[in-house]
């Protein structure tokens, strides 16, 4: 039981690149495909109209496409995340979340910087 708890804590503590690498290992070596949309999600009670009207306060900055000028995008990703060169390059090539839980203003600023470098970015 303690070993499983330790394993769960290690998985939760993975960085985005480590999680991407884990996904690739599970897929390539064990044939385990990630479920689209998250297989663990459970439907909760229906949200009332008041909940639907709430404005989102935290955003994920998602890199959709690095574009033609990957070097500038890698530089911006390094500046935003503090990752090393190889990790930033891997993230840019694989795509995915650059930053999680950013405020709206910070997320918009990151999006502008990445788009100025030539990347296609979404806020989720």
Curated annotation (Swiss-Prot):
Protein name in UniProt: Large ribosomal subunit protein bL12
Protein family according to the UniProt entry: Belongs to the bacterial ribosomal protein bL12 family.
Pfam families assigned: Ribosomal_L12, Ribosomal_L12_N
GO CC entries: cytosolic large ribosomal subunit
Function in brief: Forms part of the ribosomal stalk which helps the ribosome interact with GTP-bound translation factors. Is thus essential for accurate translation.
Binding partners and assembly: Homodimer. Part of the ribosomal stalk of the 50S ribosomal subunit. Forms a multimeric L10(L12)X complex, where L10 forms an elongated spine to which 2 to 4 L12 dimers bind in a sequential fashion. Binds GTP-bound translation factors.
Keyword ATP-binding: no
Gene3D superfamilies linked: 3.30.1390.10, Single helix bin
GO molecular function, one term: mRNA binding
Record key words, sorted: Ribonucleoprotein, Ribosomal protein
InterPro entries reported in the protein's UniProt record: Ribosomal_bL12, Ribosomal_bL12_C, Ribosomal_bL12_C/ClpS-like, Ribosomal_bL12_oligo, Ribosomal_bL12_oligo_N_sf
Gene name per UniProt: rplL
Species of provenance: Paracoccus denitrificans (strain Pd 1222)
PANTHER family noted in UniProt: 39S RIBOSOMAL PROTEIN L12, LARGE RIBOSOMAL SUBUNIT PROTEIN BL12M
GO biological process: translation
């Amino acid at each position: 039981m303690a070993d499983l708890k330790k394993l769960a804590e290690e998985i939760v503590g993975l960085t985005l690149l480590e999680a991407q690498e884990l996904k690739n290992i599970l897929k390539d070596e064990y044939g385990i495909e990630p479920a689209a949309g998250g297989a663990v999600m459970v439907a909760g009670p229906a949200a009332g109209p008041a909940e639907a009207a709430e404005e989102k306060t935290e955003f994920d900055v998602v890199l959709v496409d690095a574009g033609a000028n990957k070097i500038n995008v890698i530089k911006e990703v390094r500046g935003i995340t503090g990752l090393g060169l190889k990790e930033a390059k891997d993230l840019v090539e694989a795509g995915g979340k650059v930053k999680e839980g950013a405020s709206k203003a910070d997320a918009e600023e990151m999006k502008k910087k990445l788009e100025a470098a030539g990347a296609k970015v979404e806020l989720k």
